[in-house]
Regions:
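Non-catalytic C-terminal interaction segments of nucleic acid-processing enzymes
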Residues: 1-14, 22-28, 34-146
Length: 146
């Protein structure tokens, strides 16, 4: 079953929705996106001028996409670029989760651990993203893959 109002015109839905109130009495609805930092469209306009700009723009797009849910849900767009730059909403959300874990467990390094765990997961996927972005070239014949 889908919670009421989560389906939109293009049949896409948020990646997840909590069944309990998360903040201000509203349930959490999140949607994750991972823009390619090295994509030509991002390098020319965004990532060459400011770290995290592609992630920030992706988050803004998610907020517009789910604006109709804002009255019923606490909508969090999570944008993290392939090379690890966090969008502002993603960073605030992760810090909030880390703070909640710290309050619950007393472990002061919860936020740091959470950030490192997410960073490692992103790094695992980086090699495939980079290899897909870099086109085949004879200039790359001297590159050795480990």
């Amino acid at each position: 079953m889908e919670p009421k109002g989560t389906s939109i015109q293009d049949i896409k839905r948020p990646d997840g929705i909590s069944y309990f109130p998360f903040k201000n009495g509203r349930c959490l609805a999140w949607d994750y996106t991972c823009p390619d930092t090295l994509a030509r469209t991002h390098i020319k306009k965004f990532t060459s001028t400011q770290a995290g700009k592609a992630a920030s723009r992706a988050e803004d797009g998610k907020l517009k996409k789910y604006r109709h849910l804002n009255n019923d849900y606490y909508v969090v767009p999570i944008g993290i670029e392939t090379l690890g730059s966090f969008g502002p909403h993603a960073l605030d959300f992760i810090k909030d989760i880390g703070h909640r874990i710290t309050e619950s467990t007393g472990e002061k390094k919860s936020t740091s651990y959470l950030m490192q765990t997410i960073g490692m997961a992103i790094q695992r996927g980086n090699s495939s993203c980079i290899l897909e972005t870099v086109q085949d070239s004879k200039k790359l014949d001297g590159v050795y893959y480990l």
